Amino acid sequence: GTFDRVMRGLRLLQKHGVEYNLLTTVNRINADYPLEVYRFLSDEAGTEWIQLIPIVERLDSDGLGLRLEGTDVSDRSVRPEQFGRFMTTIFDEWVRNDVGTVYVQTFEAAVRNWLGMSSGMCVFNENCGNALAVEHNGDEYSGDHYVEPKYQLGNIADTQMVELLGSDRQRQFGRDKSETLTKQCLRCEVRFACHGECPKSRFAVSDDGEPGQHYLCAGWYEFFTHIDRPVKAMVALREAGRPASDVMAIMRAEMPDVVTLASKAPRNSPCPCGSGLKTKHCHGATSTSDPPEPTTYPVFVAEPRRRVRESQ
């Protein structure tokens, strides 16, 4: 079937060292299975680069999704809270096991925003408009989600792309992303990370009753507030000259069963938290007779290791 053919093609790319990433859409069905989706992509498919794109299809009065109109969504569109749970669950798996070996575009963008850099994704930048969509016939549009007649800027055969990017019309399109935020967005604690997401899905109503709130606002808010502390830890590690992957040991140490596992582990074995220290010098230390080992190296050693999956 199609699945088998796709997997054969993927193995062929891997065999010849061809770089690729997997773009996975998140819909109302697979959003209920975050770990199954993530572990398939990272473990079974063996990919290192993952994009997770939420499906949000607006329906107009005719029940069609041909234009950016209407406030109803299709049955396959992911629900806001469902999407938030999906993303936070995958992040928790990633931040404990796969930092530095699996790259999830949304997570990378979040870290960049916490560092005060450009996220690298137009949806999470303050303004947009720097990435035109070009169709097969050369028609150019304001953005990938705006391939509609009223957003057509011209044709590449008639006008240089740089001219269209710098046009007053396109520049205003980009500024509209920040200039049309709702009051709820403007006072939001994670606005610096979200920036209202893509305007094409701002068709919901804010808590204040103001139109123009992003449909997935509740999900994104859950995600960005959830990752705040571990991402701040990654930023602190980076600023201290240590690899961001050291955060995995920090997060594993907070797993409820770490202390229990450490109490049962041989005292000279590596601590179950993944720090690289002996158990007796980490979570298995029971008295002052077991002083910490000298820390002339980073406490949390970021050596390649097999992924440690939490039991479900």
Regions found by a protein language model. Give the residues of each.
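Acidic/negatively charged segments and metal-coordination signatures
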Residues: 242-312
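Short, intrinsically disordered, charge-biased short linear motifs at domain edges
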Residues: 170-177, 182-185, 201-206, 255-262, ...
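Charge-rich, low-complexity terminal tails
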Residues: 215-257
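Membrane-interface junctions of multi-pass transporters
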Residues: 147-191
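Short microdomains enriched in Cys/His and/or Lys/Arg
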Residues: 205-229, 290-311
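Radical SAM enzyme [4Fe-4S]-AdoMet core and its adjacent flexible, acidic
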Residues: 2-4, 11, 15-123, 127, ...
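Local cysteine-cluster metal-coordination motifs and their immediate loop/turn environment
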Residues: 142-144, 181-201, 219, 270-284
